[in-house]
From Swiss-Prot:
The gene is MT-ND5. It catalyses: a ubiquinone + NADH + 5 H(+)(in) = a ubiquinol + NAD(+) + 4 H(+)(out). Keywords: Electron transport, Membrane, Mitochondrion, Mitochondrion inner membrane, NAD, Respiratory chain, Translocase, Transmembrane, Transmembrane helix, Transport, Ubiquinone. It is found in: Mitochondrion inner membrane. InterPro entries: NADH_DH_su5_C (IPR010934), NADHpl_OxRdtase_5_subgr (IPR018393), ND/Mrp_TM (IPR001750), NU5C-like (IPR003945), Proton_antipo_N (IPR001516). Belongs to the complex I subunit 5 family. The keyword Mitochondrion applies. One of its GO terms (molecular function) is NADH dehydrogenase (ubiquinone) activity. Its EC number is 7.1.1.2. The keyword Transport applies. This is NADH-ubiquinone oxidoreductase chain 5. It comes from Petromyzon marinus. GO terms for cellular component: mitochondrial inner membrane.
Length: 598
């Protein structure tokens, strides 16, 4: 077929994917079933551009009439339909379809479900806008859109104080990242006179500029909850479980990593920024893995595993392998969404209980849920031939064959080991053993649970093989390496299994890991200590500086001190006059009498 027609079909399919999603947003009260069906239809439509790309290796850019057209600067509505867009869009749509179907059961008793589904749909559309943007303005619109929608969805249960605090916390931390992105946009506008991504990468890819690259790294740190700006991610678990599934799998938290992948040409020839990205990712992945190992809340364990995997993606970007980071982002979306839906099924059936120490033997009552949770955890561990294995193994191989940073290598290997440890602990505590809950606890699995979990389970099983076999690597791969490097992932898996068995051994007196259960006291230091110190300093400033200076120097005491010397002088003179006047009068009287007597 003529390439012109293929380009037309590809562009039309990409636009139709978005257009199909618009009716539920325009309608005042769309039904949940209609919204879910339209997302399903949109997912199948999005396969058309993907099929054309896989067959013809074709990428297009759809540009429309400029919004602003100045002498040296213009902004046009432009969509970049490349491999990142055509691959990630069907994945995001499929996951959203599964989450919406699951929500029809999970949140059946909630009011305003039409608004909830609108929020989910807007969340998805803003993410698609972000990944398909071909200029920084559209990218910023999608970037802010996912931030706003995450705030609305995390605070969905607005009657709960913790939900509102968590939503505000997410916004506050993301504001820091937004400052970095805006700083880079201003620099681009003033130095390149363009916000078009293709022009920017063409002009700056061979040079090193600190301000724009640092701004993009700060933006990714805030949005993807990297170390330093990470406390909002576990706090976001106060929202509904379907929100957590969408937030952690294919929307907001991966937006920061995707930003670095999209703008990687600016980083690829800048060793300093690559080193910073590598060390930041390594620090994030080890801290999150240590916290996940000591948590007992099922949703927080999965949330910290998300943070750890995001750190692993940042490591891949820092190794100058954005292609591998994108592959891991795609495979991670499937099993992370499935793990959250499994946790939602367990929580709902266990009467809103989230402590894994109170779960056990759930494989008898919730067989499909525990099976899918086992598959998702195994894929997260990197068990051979599951989705996570193909991408995790590539990251470890790239890290082992790199001469960049030995500390990052050691820390990342420790984090990968701990990933298997907390995933195995989650499976053992939930699925095996004797029941630790009431025998009359009602548990059931219906089609609203089964169908989404089955779809995501298939994605967790085969997505890694399909993606790595159909997408060629961007750089030449190393085909010869020592056996110990090739098998290091398997060795880490075995070691971590031993660690997890040790952690779940009930015969050993368990000690409280207060340091990591409290997230290394980082939220207390940042949220409590800093505010407490600022209040103390403010109090001292007002009471010991302002009040004292007013009272002692300017106010009543100051006036009294200033008037003390004159009043003392006058008083002394008054006392002097009081003592001398009678003597003078007596002397004058004597003189007068003496003169009279003569």
């Amino acid at each position: 077929m003529n390439s012109h027609y293929l380009t037309l079909i590809m562009n039309s399919g990409a636009l139709l994917t978005i257009i199909v999603l618009l009716p539920p947003i325009i309608m005042p009260k769309p039904s949940m079933i209609l919204t879910t069906k339209l997302v399903k239809i949109s997912m199948f439509i999005s396969l058309i551009p993907l099929t054309i790309y896989l067959n013809e290796n074709m990428e297009t850019t759809l540009t429309m009439k400029p919004w602003m057209d100045w002498a040296l600067f213009n902004i046009a509505l432009s969509f970049k339909i490349d491999k990142y867009t055509v691959i990630f869009t069907p994945i995001a749509l499929m996951i959203t379809w599964s989450i919406m179907e699951f929500s029809q059961w999970y949140m059946a008793k909630e009011r305003h479900m039409d608004k909830f589904f609108k929020y989910l749909l807007l969340f998805l559309i803003t993410m698609i806008t972000f990944i398909s943007a071909n200029n920084l303005l559209q990218l910023f619109i999608g970037w802010e859109g996912v931030g706003i929608m995450s705030f609305l969805l995390i605070s969905w249960w607005s009657g709960r104080t913790k939900a509102n605090i968590s939503a505000l916390q997410a916004v506050a931390y993301n504001r820091i990242g937004d400052i970095g992105l805006m700083m880079s946009m201003v620099w681009m506008c003033s130095n390149t006179n363009s916000w078009d991504l293709q022009q920017i990468t063409m002009l700056l890819s061979d040079q090193q500029y600190l301000i724009p690259t640092l701004g993009f790294l700060i933006a990714a740190t805030g949005k993807s909850a990297q170390f330093g700006l990470h406390p909002w991610l576990p706090a976001a678990m106060e929202g509904p479980t379907p929100v957590s599934a969408l937030l952690h799998s294919s929307t907001m938290v991966v937006a920061g990593v995707f930003l670095l992948i999209r703008l990687h040409p600016l980083f690829q020839n800048y060793p300093l920024m690559l080193e910073m990205t590598l060390c930041l990712g390594a620090m994030t992945t080890i801290c999150a893995a240590l916290c996940a190992t000591t948590q007992n809340d099922i949703k927080k364990i999965i949330a910290f595993s998300t943070s750890s995997q995001l750190g692993l993606m940042m490591v891949a970007v820092g190794l100058n392998h954005p292609h591998i980071a994108f592959l891991h982002m795609c495979t991670h979306a499937f099993f992370k969404a499935m793990l959250f839906l499994c946790s939602g099924s367990i929580i709902h059936n266990m009467n809103n209980e989230q402590d894994i120490r109170k779960f056990s033997c759930l494989n008898n009552n919730l067989p499909l849920t525990t099976t899918c949770m086992t598959i998702g955890s195994a894929a997260l561990m990197g068990l051979p031939f599951l989705a996570g294995f193909f991408t995790k193994d590539l990251i470890l191989e790239a890290l082992n064959t790199s001469y960049t940073n030995a500390w990052a290598l050691m820390v990342t290997l420790m984090a990968v080991t701990l990933t298997t440890a907390y995933s195995s602990r989650l499976i053992i505590m939930s699925a095996s053993g004797t029941p630790r809950y009431l025998p009359l606890t009602p548990t059931h699995e219906n089609n609203f649970i089964k169908n989404p979990l089955k779809r995501l389970a298939w994605g967790s099983l085969i997505s890694g093989l399909i993606l790595t076999s159909t997408l060629p690597p961007m750089k030449p791969q190393i085909f010869t390496m020592p056996t110990y490097i090739k098998t290091i992932a398997l060795m880490m898996f075995i070691i971590s299994l031993i660690i997890s068995m040790e952690l779940t051994n009930k015969k050993i007196n368990q000690t409280t890991f207060s340091f990591f259960t409290q997230l290394a006291f980082y939220p207390h230091i940042i949220h409590r200590l800093t505010s407490h110190l600022s209040l103390i300093w403010s109090q001292k400033l007002m009471t010991q500086v302002m009040d004292v200076s007013w009272l002692e120097k300017i106010g009543p005491k100051g006036l009294a001190n200033h008037q003390l010397k004159p009043s003392t002088t006058l008083t002394e003179a008054h006392h002097l006059n009081s003592a001398t006047l009678p003597l003078m009068a007596f002397a004058l009287t004597l003189i007068t009498l003496s003169l009279t007597a003569r």
